[in-house]
Amino acid sequence: MGLKLNGRYISLILAVQIAYLVQAVRAAGKCDAVFKGFSDCLLKLGDSMANYPQGLDDKTNIKTVCTYWEDFHSCTVTALTDCQEGAKDMWDKLRKESKNLNIQGSLFELCGSSNGAAGSLLPALSVLLVSLSAALATWFSF
């Protein structure tokens, strides 16, 4: 049985992880463009979710959301590639730690299996939107 957290705690966890990543990259000093790259990744994910097609069947809904999620992670890794080696490693570590939180309805759970349950789509979307809001609030505070 996994840990069950509400949206507020999930947002806090994601915000802390992103703040930790930003601080690690900021400390490196040679990654001036990484902040722009990372914010572009967040904005692209937000735009994708905002322009989410309506009226799709459940299987297509899950596939579409998971594609956005994987694109976000690929974009982030690409943005961090030009930084010192520690930033990309830190992102990969945060991604693995987030996956291990085992939060019911998370995108890691939804997109981690090829047969994700359609019923968990709405909680996952709300978790994503709350998490993005927290991430953007944290991002703008720096």
UniProtKB/Swiss-Prot annotation:
Q: In which tissues is it expressed?
A: Expressed in the brain (at protein level).
User: Which InterPro entries does the entry link to?
Assistant: Neuritin_fam (IPR026144)
Record bears the keyword rRNA-binding: no
User: Which Pfam families does the record cross-reference, listed alphabetically?
Assistant: NRN1
Q: What name does UniProt use for this protein?
A: Neuritin
Record's note on what induces expression: By synaptic activity through NMDA receptors and L-type voltage-sensitive calcium channels. By cAMP in active neurons.
Q: Signal peptide position in this chain? A: 1-27
**Location of the protein in the cell:** Cell membrane; Synapse
Relate the protein's function as given in its record. Answer: Promotes neurite outgrowth and especially branching of neuritic processes in primary hippocampal and cortical cells.
* Membrane topology summary: Lipid-anchor; GPI-anchor
For this UniProt record, the keywords arranged alphabetically read as follows: Cell membrane, Glycoprotein, GPI-anchor, Lipoprotein, Membrane, Signal, Synapse
The molecular function terms of the Gene Ontology recorded here are: identical protein binding
| Lipid group attachment sites (GPI-anchor amidated glycine) | G116
Q: What is the lineage of its organism?
A: Eukaryota, Metazoa, Chordata, Craniata, Vertebrata
